[in-house]
Structures are given as C-alpha cells and as structure tokens.
C-alpha cells in the first residue's frame, strides 16, 4: 500500500505515482489508497485509475493481508488520518519516505529521511536509478517530475539543486510534456474558484 498525507500535494502524489508504476512493472500487488480524494489539478496522473480514496468497506479486506505500507511526505504519522487505525489494527509494517524532519520517527518501522532532498519524489527517483535494470518508465517519470516541480516552486526555491534539473532533463528526454504538467496544476481552475 502506498499512501500520503491528507489534502495531498504534488510531492506526495508524484512520489506515489513514481513508485507505483515501478512496483507494478515488477508484478507486485500494489495500490495507492489515500485518506483524501485526488485533487482535480492532479487528475492527469490518474489516467490508469491508480489513485483510490480510502473507504473502509471496500479497502479493509485487502489491507489486512498486506505486508507493508509506504507513507510518503508526512511530517506526522497522524496525517494519514483513519488509515493509522487500520494499520495499527492489522499490525502492518510501515516505511516512511520523506525529506522533512520527523520528531516522532518511532511511529514507523522503517525511516528513510533525506533532509537534503528537494522533494520526496527525488528520493524515489534515486531509488529507481539503482533498483531498475531498464530505464525509468514514462509514467513513473511523470509522477517524479510533478513531485520535484511542485516542491521546488517550479524550480524557483532555494532547495532547487543540480539533481532537480537532471531529473527535469531526463523527463524532457523521455517525452514528459513539462509545460502541460504546469498547466494542469497552476493554470486550471474549478468553476467555483472562478
């Protein structure tokens, strides 16, 4: 199970997407289940219907049999809300992957925290570069680009480093239409917002 914090942002969602496609390609049984629904700005990541909104009736039966929950981009375990209760109920091991400091790391069985990483998505990228024998898939790269672009303020913040640009170059070289990612997130509005 892959999940991220309530009211998810581009980094959490992009990291989930990046790792999801890798694991699916390895024939692992994997699902993305989040406490909050997918925000409309990120629907372009969901063309394959990979993002699910947690519902105890439809998910708990599957969750009780899994071996690991990977939690992305959460400074606090409780930010995955009711999923915490399910994880504790079934005593499922948890792995935290994040680039923020964690005062309460003991909530997780495993912690992978890199305070120097610009985004959790860049940590997923680093993992995929080592774990894969073949190139990173375009679907994974789309998620990773989303994570890095949003958490660096479109490459404007001080956390933007060489690796961020290397990731962007790899994404461009593999057909990610970076301008469309920007448009989906920042140039579309709901009717109610207009």
Task: Kindly give the residue locations of the regions a language model identified.
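Anionic-ligand anchoring segments at beta-strand to alpha-helix junctions in alpha/beta enzyme folds, i.e.
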Residues: 1-65
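A structured phosphate/pyrophosphate-recognition subdomain
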Residues: 1-8, 17-24, 104-194
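Fold-independent oxyanion-binding glycine-rich loops
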Residues: 4-5, 35-36, 56, 68, ...
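Residues at alpha-helix caps and immediate loop-helix transition turns in enzyme cores, especially N-
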Residues: 12-15, 82-83, 160
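Short phosphate-binding/catalytic loops that engage adenosine nucleotides
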Residues: 27-28, 92, 176
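Short alpha-helical
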Residues: 37-40, 78, 119, 163
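A residue-level signal for conserved active-site and pocket-lining positions in enzyme catalytic cores
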Residues: 42, 70, 124
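Active-site cofactor/cluster-binding pocket
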Residues: 50-110
């Amino acid at each position: 199970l892959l999940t991220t914090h309530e009211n998810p942002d581009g980094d959490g969602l992009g990291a989930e997407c990046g790792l999801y496609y890798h694991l699916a390609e390895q024939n692992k049984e994997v699902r993305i289940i989040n406490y909050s629904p997918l925000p409309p700005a990120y629907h372009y990541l969901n063309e394959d219907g990979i993002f699910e909104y947690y519902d105890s009736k439809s998910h708990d039966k599957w969750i009780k049999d899994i071996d690991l929950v990977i939690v992305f981009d959460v400074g606090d375990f409780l930010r995955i809300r009711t999923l915490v209760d399910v994880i504790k109920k079934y005593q499922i091991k948890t792995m935290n992957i994040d680039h923020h400091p964690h005062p309460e790391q003991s909530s997780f069985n495993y912690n992978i925290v890199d305070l120097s990483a610009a985004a959790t998505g860049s940590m997923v990228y680093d993992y995929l570069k080592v774990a894969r024998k073949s190139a990173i898939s375009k679907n994974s790269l789309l998620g990773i680009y989303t994570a890095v672009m949003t958490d660096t303020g479109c490459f404007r913040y001080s956390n933007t480093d060489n690796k961020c640009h290397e990731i962007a170059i790899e994404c461009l070289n593999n057909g990610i239409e970076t301008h469309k990612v920007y448009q989906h997130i920042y140039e579309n509005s709901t009717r109610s917002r207009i």
